[in-house]
Regions:
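A short C-terminal helix-loop "cap" of Rossmann-like NAD(P)-dependent dehydrogenase/epimerase domains
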Residues: 13-24, 80
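Conserved C-terminal active-site "lid" loop/helix of NAD(P)H-dependent oxidoreductases
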Residues: 36, 95-132
Length: 152
């Protein structure tokens, strides 16, 4: 995440900002994320630390977010109220099934998995090098939400 979000995050953010993205239910899935500013710091640390010796590192902000958490953070950043109602998960399942059959619909099982699947990783090895992220999604959007909203 960052001021200029890309891909699915940008679609979700713009959908929330425009009012067409449906409120996600809490499914307790787990997703890892990192702020672009922290990712750059991690890359510079890895590139300059002799202990890395060509190893591969995973960089996260250390938090596990559900898709509902991400939805709520984006609502706050766009100044939208978090709806008290949610769209049931089965509605998304049905839409994904229809999208798999009717190819021109922009929502299918691939997008469904992107929203409700787990993508959770550990950056313990990177922390051993001394990496500490400066942001989590909520603190970043609280500080820079207006800039994010203007640039997406």
């Amino acid at each position: 995440y960052g001021v200029k979000m890309k891909g699915n995050l940008a679609i979700m953010f713009n959908g929330i900002k425009s009012g067409w993205f449906p409120p996600l239910p809490e499914t307790f899935n787990k997703r890892s994320m990192i702020c672009i500013n922290d990712l750059i710091d991690a890359i510079l640390l890895i590139a300059s630390d002799g202990r890395t010796n060509g190893r591969i590192y995973i960089a996260t902000d250390g938090h596990q977010y559900s898709s509902r958490d991400i939805y709520k953070a984006m609502c706050l950043a766009t100044g939208k109220n978090i709806p008290i109602w949610v769209t049931p998960k089965f509605v998304f399942s049905l839409l994904a099934w229809i999208g798999d059959i009717v190819k021109y619909i922009p929502f299918n099982s691939h997008r469904y998995k992107k929203i409700f699947g787990n993508e959770c990783y550990s950056s313990v090895e990177l922390h051993k090098l001394g990496f500490t992220p400066k942001y989590d999604l909520f603190s970043y959007l609280k500080k820079y939400g207006k800039s994010v909203a203007e640039n997406n």
